[in-house]
């Protein structure tokens, strides 16, 4: 169903799009804005949906909050007159909140009670507004964050928002989560209900100290445990001795792998496992061939010093030349090597969010960055359809239905301590199905798990 709205004073045309997913009891909502005039129009706020609840109810909001290593902490609180705002301004979905909500009348549990719920399919800045008006009506608005947002709409051009999905169940929070799980597995995930392999990741064993010899030995240990997929984490690429150099130069380091990755991959396959690799394509170290050649490719303000965090800067994925460079390097890596799995990481938040010489309004950065990410990742998926991809962002900082159209799994948290993971994964499970949840078994310090 499309509802067409025309501004009576300006040549602006808005289309409210609805689609019913009857098999899942979900409604899809998005918005298109069309410039019917002869001059450009600048959009500064356009949400995907506003979901209205039955009138005169006293409602409770469920959402998740968190931080690094403590994501997806379930919160429940009453909604009172005013506006409750949840958002991300971090270029990713964020560790601190998630574009998901569940609302009940304060008495629902896992098995019974009416629950209204919804999500946003987007991997960048977002905003959720849960509002109780002075007339007692309750509504939830969800979409792109209007903070520092703008989009210049040329004549005859169309801007489309991300999609929001919402539903209702009389059977409690468990039924609400299972509805989202079924929909995500059947309609969103690239490999649907695929059962993923048991993997071994090199990071906590060797950190950056990787080479053919050390990783071959580690692969033998992994194979003896019955592991099916061996993943080499950070440290394998050009100039990577520690976290101060190498990001952006996505080819094997010739000192660590003088004959490329093939000898290690052959060893892993001979042991009966497939091979996976860690990358962080959106980042660059100042000490890298890429940055020395293209210092203008990072997100920055020309009048301010560039803030280096984790010894790295963020590549501007809104730029097509940046997209093409990363696409070329990763496509070559996958084409030349038998890589079955990629862990795509994104480890720092944005600062100085500038785009010098942007072709339009520089504030388009927030949306065009995510569109560029989707283009690169989506193209790689098309060219290498059998590869399994994992979304990681310093843990669970990029977890949403938008990224799950590209990634098969989400690294839920960098916190691998078992008792902490119980709460993290409980919150995660309200939104996402279990087959998207990646977890490790690691050693835990006695201070974290006291015998008492």
Please give the residue ranges for each predicted region.
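Polysaccharide-binding surfaces and accessory modules of carbohydrate-active proteins
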Residues: 1-132, 147
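Active-site and adjacent substrate-binding regions of carbohydrate-active enzymes
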Residues: 13, 31-33, 207, 238, ...
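Short loop/turn motifs at secondary-structure junctions
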Residues: 27, 42, 160, 225-226, ...
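Short acidic, Pro/Gly- and aromatic-enriched capping/linker segments at domain boundaries
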Residues: 134-154, 386
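Short Pro-Gly-centered flexible turn/kink motifs
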Residues: 151-169
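Terminal connector regions
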Residues: 167-197
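Aromatic-lined carbohydrate-binding/catalytic grooves of carbohydrate-active enzymes
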Residues: 191-328, 341, 358
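Glycan-recognition surfaces
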Residues: 285-324, 367-452
């Amino acid at each position: 169903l499309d509802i067409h709205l025309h501004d009576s004073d300006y040549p602006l045309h808005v289309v409210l799009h609805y689609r019913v997913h009857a098999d899942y009891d979900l409604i899809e909502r998005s918005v298109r804005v069309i410039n019917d005039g002869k001059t450009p129009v600048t959009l500064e706020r356009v949400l995907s949906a506003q979901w209205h609840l039955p009138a005169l109810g006293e409602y409770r909001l469920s959402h998740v909050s968190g931080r690094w290593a403590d994501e997806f902490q379930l919160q429940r609180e009453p909604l009172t007159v005013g506006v409750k705002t949840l958002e991300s301004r971090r270029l990713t979905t964020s560790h601190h909140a998630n574009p998901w909500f569940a609302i009940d009348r304060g008495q629902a549990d896992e098995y019974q009670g009416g629950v209204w719920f919804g999500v946003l399919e987007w991997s960048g800045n977002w905003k959720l507004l849960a509002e109780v008006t002075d007339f007692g009506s309750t509504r939830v608005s969800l979409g792109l964050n209007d903070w520092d947002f703008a989009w210049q709409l040329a004549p005859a051009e169309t801007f489309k928002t991300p999609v929001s999905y919402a539903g209702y169940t009389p059977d409690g929070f468990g039924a609400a989560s299972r509805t989202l799980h079924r929909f995500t597995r059947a309609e969103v995930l690239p490999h649907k209900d695929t059962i993923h392999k048991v993997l071994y990741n090199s990071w906590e064993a060797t950190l950056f100290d990787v080479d053919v010899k050390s990783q071959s030995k580690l692969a033998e240990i992994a194979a003896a445990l019955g592991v099916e997929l061996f993943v080499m984490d950070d440290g394998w690429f050009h100039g990577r001795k520690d976290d101060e150099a190498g990001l952006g130069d996505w080819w094997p380091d010739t000192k660590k792998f003088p004959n490329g990755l093939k000898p290690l991959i052959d060893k892993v396959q001979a042991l009966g496992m497939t091979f996976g690799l860690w990358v962080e394509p959106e980042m660059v170290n100042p000490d890298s061939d890429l940055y020395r050649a293209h210092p203008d490719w990072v997100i920055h303000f020309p009048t301010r010093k560039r803030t280096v965090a984790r010894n790295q800067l963020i590549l501007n994925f809104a730029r097509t030349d940046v997209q093409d460079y990363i696409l070329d390097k990763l496509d070559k890596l996958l084409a030349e090597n038998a890589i079955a799995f990629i862990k795509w990481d994104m480890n720092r938040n944005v600062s100085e969010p500038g785009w010098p010489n942007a072709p339009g309004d520089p504030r388009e950065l927030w949306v065009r960055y995510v569109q560029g990410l989707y283009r690169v990742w989506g193209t790689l998926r098309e060219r290498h359809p059998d590869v399994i991809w994992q979304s990681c962002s310093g843990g669970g900082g990029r977890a949403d239905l938008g990224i799950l159209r590209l990634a098969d799994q989400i690294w839920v948290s960098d916190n691998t301590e078992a008792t902490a993971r119980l709460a993290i994964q409980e919150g995660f499970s309200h939104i996402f199905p279990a087959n998207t949840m990646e977890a490790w078994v690691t050693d835990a310090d006695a201070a974290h798990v006291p015998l008492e």
